[in-house]
Regions:
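N-terminal ligand-binding/catalytic initiation module
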Residues: 1-63, 71, 81, 230
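Glycine-rich Rossmann-fold phosphate-binding loop(s) that bind the pyrophosphate
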Residues: 89-91
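NAD(P)-binding Rossmann-fold cofactor-contacting core
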Residues: 103-131
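Rossmann-fold NAD(P) dinucleotide-binding segment
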Residues: 150, 157-172
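Adenosine-phosphate binding glycine-rich loop
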Residues: 186-247
Length: 247
């Protein structure tokens, strides 16, 4: 790649849907082409002469970018003596958050909770070997949060995944998206930091709208019937924010 400066544009194309489990939990699922496939691209340009320099599949890069943001937040905001992490969610982003926490703090124990028992057990086995720390699968979100120095929620849930009163003094909290966090938690934080809110500005219509899914910067379009199935606009808690959010 030629010397900079550079300008990067990320484009992601998804078919989104919102299944509801038997116990009433609502999540957001996405795919491109067919379930299980993904399409995300980063296009890199030279700002010196405008030439396109690269087109990169962002399947791995996107996880690393978001994880790096979480790591930077923990480096500057988590207590220096932080040793324990509570993780809600067992997917790729949950793994991506835990790794940088281990890089910036001497993490020795992680408690992981996912509603899917098989997934949380697999997460615990994999990450304990990868990071050489104790990773313990627990049976409830409450147990995952109790007593930890760093709390990380990285889920596809459309509703809060923990209660505000669970947040303890001195706890550092990282959230992947605004819907995971209860509004009342804002009152328990001493400081809130978020990544930039810049996004593409486009005219919205009844069939083309923003802020309707987990990503506050994404636009969703569809037929009138399809738009009826789309979630309501994202809530606007006192601190707002893009993902991830740190406190």
């Amino acid at each position: 790649v030629r010397p900079g400066p550079y300008f990067a544009i990320r484009m992601k194309s998804d078919v989104a849907y919102w299944p509801r489990s038997a116990d009433g939990r609502s999540t957001e699922k996405k795919y491109s082409g067919q379930p299980g496939l993904y399409c995300g691209l980063v296009m890199l340009f030279s700002t010196a002469h405008g030439a396109p320099l690269a087109m990169i599949n962002d399947g791995v890069l996107q996880h690393k970018r978001v994880g790096a943001g979480a790591g930077i937040g923990a480096r500057y905001l988590a207590r220096a003596d932080a040793r324990t992490v509570g993780v809600l969610g067992s997917g790729g982003m949950a793994r991506t958050f835990l790794e940088p926490f281990k890089c910036v703090r001497d993490i020795r124990l992680c408690k992981i909770y996912s509603p899917n028992a098989k997934h949380r057990e697999e997460f615990a086995e994999e990450m304990s070997k990868r990071l050489n720390i104790e990773v313990r699968a627990v049976d409830s979100a409450r147990e995952a949060v109790r007593g930890v120095d760093i709390l990380s929620s990285a889920t596809d849930s459309m509703k809060p995944v923990y209660d505000a009163e669970w947040i303890e003094k001195g706890m550092h909290v990282t959230n992947l998206g605004r819907r995971e966090m209860p509004d009342a938690s804002a009152e328990r934080f001493d400081l809130v930091v978020r990544q930039g809110t810049a996004g593409l500005q486009m005219k919205q219509t009844e069939r083309f709208q923003a802020e309707r899914g987990l990503s506050p910067a994404a636009f969703i379009g569809g037929s009138p019937e399809e738009m009826k199935r789309v979630p309501e606009k994202n809530p606007e808690p006192g601190f707002g924010g893009d993902s991830p959010e740190f406190s």
